[in-house]
Amino acid sequence: MCNIAAYVGTKQAAPIIVEMLRKQEGWDSGYYTGIATIHEGKLHMEKDACNLETLLQQTDITKLPGTIGMIHGRSRGADDYRFAHPFISTNGKLAYIANGCGGIFKADKTKFPEVYERLTNLGYRFTSLVEGDYKQLPGGKKVHGSDLKCQNINYYMDNGLGIVDAMEAAYCERGSEIVSLALYTEEPDRITFGRMNYPMFIGIADHGIYMATTPMVFPEDARDITLLPPTSAGQVFMDHYTVKPFKNPPCKVAPLTPVVYRDCYDAVVAALEENDMDHDQIDRLLRPMIPGGDCPPESALDYMILNDLQNQGRLIIKTTQMPGVKEGSIRTQFIASLKK
């Protein structure tokens, strides 16, 4: 699980998305941080294996130019900045970030190396490639799954697909329980998204559109907050967005009905009345409670419930410090608690 924020509009994007990530970093990120914007047809990017505050101290990311951008904080992984998002396509035109995991698709051990071998043989490059005693690829090699997805989108675009259809093709060829965003230099006025089951909310403002993993972090002027549809891809512009459902989705995402929400809300409240919980613990509570599909959207439901509790004034967000990726580094962990 990771955390994402994005913006497209008339204002400078970087300061806006930095503040949105700051408000959610403790839920399930802070080990790695990365940001990308587009300005005058060029990608601007910074990333490292550190929390947001450290990246702010090391770089001037709030000064990155452009009125369109995205930022990413991720959970623990290899101790290497190369595993931080965004990933850049081999042609240098696409920046890609994602949130999620293999989930129900993790058991398929063949598709990943098949896609990697095809792309490698065609000359696509993986900046996250590390060598060691890994079991993911032949020869003990390993690449980040989002790097693979990024280069595969590049491949499908090189073979004639538009970016939305390329996103769908990459999602459906090798399934993952994820959501992702992409910036493309040849379409500098929009953010492309793909969503399987992990959450991506949008909020409308007079000057543009916000996007985030959780609605809890939107600025006060956000309205008409909406969860983007599952098993779909589309694009977000400053004043509207488009959605295209996958023709042959690799899984069925369970629907979030009012009854499901009520039952899950009650379960979370009951659990929090007994003990404080972090985001992962709430996810594990909710996942088996969502019927009607093989790919439950538990993280979206988790954040919807926490957002409602926050709006009701019932939620307390406690913080604790935990070790980061690099020696001596730290990250902040959020813990959900109810007012007694």
What kind of region is each of these model predictions?
Residues M1-K340:
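Conserved short alpha-helical segments that host acidic/polar catalytic motifs at enzyme active sites
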